[in-house]
């Protein structure tokens, strides 16, 4: 099925994952008003920050073709084999479980077919879930399979270990996109809105650049490599929760906009954002990034060093090699794999391990962690780390934080090289 844009030109973009069309679950108008009235009378489950972001992605169609939080069969299939196991989506590739949890006492009070309100931690009613089943899981097994570790210091593992004792499965109706549309009006875009922008540009091949950091020179280099290959690049910023020490989304938005305005052709790049929290699942999260970027209309995902990683839990390029084990029939969006990138003093330019003939002593390897560490400790930042306009924005941000209130930034794993 070929989708049609508002001006009736057929779309050249990749189709959504596992579906001919997007499947947003967000209610609007009178249907939303009636659902809100109903929700106010229902028992409630309070969402974690991660679950809230997942629910919003259901709402906007970012998790097409899923219709709600996974049941036990799907949880097991995804954790062990990265495949859904039930319903119309049985056999579909999906790399990370999308689940809702609750305390045992809450779960024990629920029966199949019951409706429960899904409420954010600030009290906002976010949605309604119709209970399919409740089930317990082996949390350590999920962590080992998804994160390759059960270390409670890993932020993603910590989220799983701290979630409720019982998972609640069921279809959802989404009633709110939270603060994202008003807090980030310039860059927060639904998959349908993003596809409309890409279609209006006439793009067919689009590379997504996933970022949770302001863009330094290596990021800029990766994006420009992708522009040479594809019609354009979607710089797609995570707008949900991060770990302590990461730079807030509003600062990143300003820094990225400044970089685009000064160093990119305007007709080759789009800045946008999406509402998820980071899971820091490394290779598995890279696959999830590809799945939902397909829903946003992207044919490719830029996968560089330590994509979606944290600390030293993953090898520098594990997030690239995992794609080698995924069939092309399972995932249309393909990785653009790019190796080590760095500033070379001898080349006097950005380069990569494929293009530069010079010794490692000439290379300045740039990472977001190194940049954050230098800025948070008021150290000098080499001029080849980041563009001066971007650096000024970041310095202004750190100047507003008392030195003893800044989170410690540690160099470990690939970021320490």
From Swiss-Prot:
It is an enzyme of class 2 (transferase). One of its GO terms (biological process) is sulfate assimilation. Keywords: ATP-binding, Nucleotide-binding, Nucleotidyltransferase, Transferase. Pathway: Sulfur metabolism; hydrogen sulfide biosynthesis; sulfite from sulfate: step 1/3. The keyword Chaperone does not apply. One of its GO terms (molecular function) is ATP binding. Pfam families: ATP-sulfurylase, PUA_2. InterPro entries: ATP-Sase_PUA-like_dom (IPR025980), PUA-like_sf (IPR015947), Rossmann-like_a/b/a_fold (IPR014729), SO4_adenylyltransferase_pro (IPR020792), Sulfurylase_cat_dom (IPR024951), Sulphate_adenylyltransferase (IPR002650). Its EC number is 2.7.7.4. It catalyses: sulfate + ATP + H(+) = adenosine 5'-phosphosulfate + diphosphate. PANTHER family: PTHR43509, SULFATE ADENYLYLTRANSFERASE. NCBIfam families: PRK04149.1, sopT. Belongs to the sulfate adenylyltransferase family. HAMAP family: Sulf_adenylyltr. This is Sulfate adenylyltransferase. The lineage of its organism: Bacteria, Pseudomonadati, Pseudomonadota, Gammaproteobacteria, Moraxellales. The gene is sat.
């Amino acid at each position: 099925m070929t989708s049609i844009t508002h001006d009736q030109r057929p779309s050249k973009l990749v189709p959504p994952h596992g579906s001919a069309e997007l499947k947003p679950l967000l209610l609007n108008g009178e249907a939303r008003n009636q659902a809100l009235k109903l929700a106010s009378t229902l028992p409630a489950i309070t969402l974690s920050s991660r679950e809230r972001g997942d629910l919003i992605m259901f709402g906007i169609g970012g998790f097409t073709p899923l219709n709600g939080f996974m049941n036990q069969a799907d949880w097991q299939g995804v954790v062990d084999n990265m495949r859904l196991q039930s319903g119309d989506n049985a056999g579909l590739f999906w790399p990370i479980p999308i689940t809702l949890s609750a305390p045992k006492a809450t779960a024990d009070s629920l029966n199949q077919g019951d409706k429960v309100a899904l409420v954010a931690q600030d009290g906002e009613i976010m949605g309604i879930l119709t209970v399919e089943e409740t089930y317990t899981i082996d949390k350590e097994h999920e962590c080992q399979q998804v994160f390759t570790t059960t270390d409670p210091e890993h932020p993603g593992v910590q989220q799983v270990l701290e979630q409720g004792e019982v998972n609640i499965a069921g279809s959802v109706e989404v009633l709110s996109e939270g603060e994202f549309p008003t807090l980030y009006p310039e860059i927060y875009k639904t998959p349908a809105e993003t596809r409309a922008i890409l279609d209006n540009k006439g793009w067919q091949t689009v590379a997504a650049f996933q970022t949770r950091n302001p863009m330094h020179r290596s990021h800029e280099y990766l994006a420009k490599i992708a522009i040479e290959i594809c019609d354009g690049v979607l710089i797609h910023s995570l707008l949900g929760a991060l770990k302590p020490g990461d730079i807030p989304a509003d600062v990143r938005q300003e820094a990225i906009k400044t970089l685009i305005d000064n160093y990119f052709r305007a007709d080759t790049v789009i800045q946008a954002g999406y509402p998820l929290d980071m899971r820091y699942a490394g290779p598995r999260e890279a696959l999830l990034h590809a799945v939902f970027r397909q829903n946003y209309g992207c044919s490719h995902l830029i996968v560089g060093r330590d994509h979606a990683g944290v600390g030293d839990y993953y090898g520098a390029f594990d997030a690239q090699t995992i794609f080698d084990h995924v069939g092309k029939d399972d995932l249309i969006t393909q990785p653009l794999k790019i190796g080590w990138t760095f500033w070379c003093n001898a080349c006097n330019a950005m380069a990569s391990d494929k293009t530069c003939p010079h010794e490692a002593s000439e290379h300045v390897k740039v990472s977001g962690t190194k940049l954050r560490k230098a800025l948070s400790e008021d150290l000098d930042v080499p001029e080849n780390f980041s563009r001066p306009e971007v650096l000024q924005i970041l310095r202004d941000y750190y100047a507003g934080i008392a030195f003893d209130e800044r989170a410690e930034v540690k160099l470990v794993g690939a970021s320490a090289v």
